[in-house]
């Protein structure tokens, strides 16, 4: 289901999904307009290329989205980002969450099923 007039970012390469075999991959969900505006998944992969971990790269995108919207007082939406490096390191972050409700990423690795707890920028009540 999609609200009429809303933009879907998921099928747009570089926005909802981006993969580079030399670096890793990232995916995003939430307010599509913000993910499109920042080329969100591409941005995360490029942050990893420059040396950031997947977690740091996801957090960097959340901060970028908040900054280009004029700060936390203007954030009335949420975006969530996941990333994996070519070596299998993962990360996830969201712009806002309730206290104690950290974003999580479920994934399969050579060690079996795992759940990774990420971070968020803004705590909501």
Go through the PLM ranges and name each one.
Residues 1-125:
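N-terminal nucleophile
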